[in-house]
């Protein structure tokens, strides 16, 4: 039986470079990105957190943002400080979940959906494109 957990997400940086986010068997969330669009890859780099599921999207301003579940189900996210740049670091969204995914609204705001431990569908969206979350 295949695991229902999503262990890979692919994003596109504003300059066209692909970036892959993935969870290896040891549970550590890693990423790798192209040096230039359509070129070779940089090499695997740990994001310094353990996860069991990952999803990602691009903010309206071009910064990538990832959402993930920790091994104990905490819903967290991390984002680039500038398009194609360094990452902020783990931030909890103060919720627990069993599954998650993210998509962009027509106006560019990212909206996160997750199935809570209670089995209910929850969501959280940005208040404005590339902005803070509704919470």
Which residues fall in each region the model found?
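A structural motif
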Residues: 1-135
